[in-house]
Amino acid sequence: MNISIISVGKIKEKFLKAAIDEYSKRLSKYCKLNIIEVPDEKTPDNASLKEENIIKEKEGTLILKHIKDNSFVIALDLKGKSIASEEFSDLIENCRLTGNSTIAFVIGGSLGLSEQVLSRANYRLSFSKMTFPHQLFRVMLLEQVYRAFRILCREPYHK
């Protein structure tokens, strides 16, 4: 299975890079992982809604360039569906069983995802109604993908 994580912005903090590297290493036994970073657009203080939408559209265009036609796209979205870890593992397994061996997870920048990206998504997923920094969220997503594979392989993992 091929999994891409397409994310807006670069990870600068060493502790987050270390966690990403650790989960990437752990996931290598279950899937081919590709992490793609697209540049984030600078958001001016007190940006208007129109300015925010333009920024999201620019970031969205960059994101869409990295999504393959055959990808099952899961957009991380505050308005998405919240599911348990077991349901998340079922979602990944259902992709595999229905011939979608390529999954692209998309993490937006500080303003979220553009309508173009949300329209391309096959599934909208929310981890919580809370807002998280998108850099930290990448680590959280990797952990849940790792947990999902452990569940699917019936391997022990802390609860």
From Swiss-Prot:
Pfam families: SPOUT_MTase. One of its GO terms (cellular component) is cytoplasm. The keyword rRNA processing applies. It comes from the Bacteria. GO terms for molecular function: rRNA (pseudouridine-N3-)-methyltransferase activity. Its EC number is 2.1.1.177. It catalyses: pseudouridine(1915) in 23S rRNA + S-adenosyl-L-methionine = N(3)-methylpseudouridine(1915) in 23S rRNA + S-adenosyl-L-homocysteine + H(+). It is an enzyme of class 2 (transferase). Its main location: cytoplasm. Specifically methylates the pseudouridine at position 1915 (m3Psi1915) in 23S rRNA. Belongs to the RNA methyltransferase RlmH family. Homodimer. This is Ribosomal RNA large subunit methyltransferase H. It comes from Clostridium botulinum (strain 657 / Type Ba4).
